[in-house]
């Protein structure tokens, strides 16, 4: 047992619940704003088009179609909303 271990033992409270509470309080504002933006009508419609495309492509065994365009449309709509709201939530 070294000096560092002894100092660590003296400074830690040893209460794992306290450490968990501190970790739970941290919430990424980007995640929160993205979730809010995904509820907007424009994003909901883009997600529906993406999900329909995914179902269509998944149901076929041999297809060259992919859902890249639909994915980019959804991400663009969501990120456009996020860009206007994110910095209002930062300190």
From Swiss-Prot:
- Is this entry keyworded Isomerase? no
| Membrane topology reported for the UniProt record | Peripheral membrane protein
Question: Which regions span the lipid bilayer?
Answer: none
Gene Ontology MF terms: ubiquinol-cytochrome-c reductase activity
Which cell locations does it reside in? Mitochondrion inner membrane
One Pfam family recorded for the sequence: UCR_hinge
Give me the disulphide-bonded residues: 37-81, 53-67
**One cellular component (GO) term of this entry:** respiratory chain complex
Point out residues bearing the modification N6-acetyllysine. Answer: 42, 85
Region Disordered, as annotated, extends over: 1-30
Q: Which Gene3D superfamilies match?
A: Ubiquinol-cytochrome C reductase hinge domain
Q: Where is the transit peptide?
A: 1-13
Q: Which InterPro entries match?
A: Cyt_b-c1_6, Ubol_cytC_Rdtase_hinge_dom, Ubol_cytC_Rdtase_hinge_dom_sf
Ranges of compositional bias, category Acidic residues: 14-27
User: Main role?
Assistant: Component of the ubiquinol-cytochrome c oxidoreductase, a multisubunit transmembrane complex that is part of the mitochondrial electron transport chain which drives oxidative phosphorylation.
Subunit and partners: Component of the ubiquinol-cytochrome c oxidoreductase (cytochrome b-c1 complex, complex III, CIII), a multisubunit enzyme composed of 11 subunits. The complex is composed of 3 respiratory subunits cytochrome b, cytochrome c1 and Rieske protein UQCRFS1, 2 core protein subunits UQCRC1/QCR1 and UQCRC2/QCR2, and 6 low-molecular weight protein subunits UQCRH/QCR6, UQCRB/QCR7, UQCRQ/QCR8, UQCR10/QCR9, UQCR11/QCR10 and subunit 9, the cleavage product of Rieske protein UQCRFS1.
**Pathology noted in the entry:** Mitochondrial complex III deficiency, nuclear type 11: A form of mitochondrial complex III deficiency, a disorder of the mitochondrial respiratory chain resulting in a highly variable phenotype depending on which tissues are affected. MC3DN11 is an autosomal recessive form characterized by recurrent episodes of severe lactic acidosis, hyperammonemia, hypoglycemia, and encephalopathy.
Protein family membership: Belongs to the UQCRH/QCR6 family.
- What is the recorded name of this protein? Cytochrome b-c1 complex subunit 6, mitochondrial
